[in-house]
Amino acid sequence: MHEMSFAEAIIRNVLRFAEEKQAKTVTSVRVRVGELLLINPEQLQFCFSVASKGTIAEGAKLEISVERADIRCLLCGRELSKDEMLCECGGFAQVKGGKDFILESVVVEV
């Protein structure tokens, strides 16, 4: 379950930010996850709650938005699905989006 390593990374960064702001509590965290990372949002929610236990982020709301993959044929420009790496025209796919994992915002109480 690679969701736990992502949850731990979120918590590390959130706690670093909260410490810089001298926060007492973290109330919410928002992340954007690329669909090509194959992260299950429900599992990430669970792992976040486990990883945040005993920290000032315990009980914080985790908002997850999934970024759709942007995959296009290099020859004809047709949009392809994440399961297509070769277009009907014979062109190969170029992946431009859906691979990122971004911590978008952290809300804290000082």
Curated annotation (Swiss-Prot):
User: Is DNA damage one of the keywords UniProt gives this record?
Assistant: no
* Gene3D superfamilies per record: 3.30.2320.80
What are the alphabetically sorted keywords of the record? Metal-binding, Nickel, Zinc
Name the Gene Ontology biological process terms. protein maturation; protein modification process
The entry's Ni(2+)-binding residues are: 2
Q: Can you tell me which residues bind Zn(2+)?
A: 73, 76, 87, 89
> From the UniProt record, which GO molecular function terms apply?
nickel cation binding; zinc ion binding
Pfam families xrefs: HypA
Q: Main role?
A: Involved in the maturation of [NiFe] hydrogenases. Required for nickel insertion into the metal center of the hydrogenase.
Family of the protein in this entry: Belongs to the HypA/HybF family.
Name this polypeptide is given: Hydrogenase maturation factor HypA
